[in-house]
Amino acid sequence: NKIFLDYEAIEKIIINNQELKSLEALVNSSRFNLSSKVSKKFPTLNLQANGLPKYVAGKNFNSNTQKTKTSQFSANPSLNIRLDLIDPLRDSEIKIARESYKIAKNNFEIKRKDLIQEARARYHKYQKSYQDIENKKLTLEASITSFKNAEAKLKAGIGTKFEVLEADAQLSRDEQILNEKKIQHEINKISLREILDIKDEFEIKKSQKLTGFWNYKLNKNLREGLQNNLSLQNLSLQKEIKKNQSINYSNAYKPSVYISNSFSSGFTKGDAASISLDSSEYGSSYTNTISLNFSWTIFDGGENKNSYKSSKAEAEAEEFSFNNLKNILKTNISTAYLNLKLNEEKILSSLKEISSTSESLRLARLRYDVGISTLKDVLVRQKELSNAKSKNINAIYNYNLTLDELERLTFLEKNKDCIEKDNNKNKSICNMKK
């Protein structure tokens, strides 16, 4: 059974994309890394045991003393606790890990939104290919009609062989174009299946409609787009990471202080270095050592000093990248906004052109039927109508693409209803059905 793929469901289905799953794993990795860095605030506890148990057996011979023997079991567990009181690197490392985690989450969201936009674009393209096929089918039917009319007139003695050949050539061209559109349709289907990771057969709504309206002014587009852009946020976070890295290198010359407590114990059973072994002998001992420790790197050949300068320079570079991306986003948002307005005009003008060329074709056929026009005129009008329909299909396709692009760039949602001050019955995108 075929599943029905709805345009609105793309956002939910895209989570199956393999590339997105890969980025999700990286988010988890960054989260675990952050937890690892935060854990440095807490004490560490280590348990060691040298032989659990350990058995020693042997003999010792010396010409000046009596021979001794050893046969003994022993265990020497120790417990060590360490707490870093002053760690000059810890806070900046935690900040770096936290900012890296935010970047990983932003990267996931950036890719998710990019994939949604790309999947929607492929959906529109697949839907458009349905309309292209229907348009070329109608064109082919018109060419068949023209060919039959030319043959009929030739048989009746009022037509020419040239007109028949001309109609036949046009028919062949239209058949070839239709075949190309069908192949492109299958390619578009494969492309949509790949990005959504759909295993089963599926179908979509074939009719091409506007997916929404855009009622926001350009200033609001720019303001929201710059405030909410995740790539800009990532560059700011990268800058903070570089700053914290430079702090890390600077703090490497500061002392670290930690307190440690070591508890060691020993248990024995048996005898050691004895003339006469006593297997029932046993003993135990313990020591507890608590200390305040100090570590300070005085000189490292300038390694951390130069690394500090390097990170500061990289932070400045991120600032330039931020400003550059900001300018690019302003251009992209403004371009998309103006393209949307342009496509609105193209939709309306192409509808008017379809109406005019349809009437022109009808009149051309009537003139040809009564013998006051040529087949060439009919074929020209026929091609004009097909081109007008193609313009309308492309205009709706580009309108929907630009609408999705504006959503992606500004983080605003498209509107279901159209609000336009200069709306009138004769010429407005608001009068088109979604």
Q: What is the predicted role of each segment?
A:
Residues 1-50, 98, 196-245, 297-298, ...:
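Bacterial Sec-pathway N-terminal export signals of envelope proteins
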Residues 2, 48-83, 206-213, 247, ...:
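Small/polar, glycine/serine/threonine/aspartate-rich low-complexity segments that form flexible
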Residues 157, 197-198, 371, 410-412:
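Short helix-capping/hinge motifs at transmembrane helix termini and TM-loop junctions
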Residues 11-21, 28-43, 78-96, 106-113, ...:
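A glycine-/polar-enriched beta->alpha junction
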Residues 1-8, 114-228, 336-339, 343, ...:
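Periplasmic alpha-helical coiled-coil/stalk elements that build and connect Gram-negative outer-membrane
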Residues 22-37, 111, 115-134, 145, ...:
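Amphipathic alpha-helical coiled-coil segments
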Residues 1, 6, 10, 391-434:
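Acidic, low-complexity, intrinsically disordered peripheral segments
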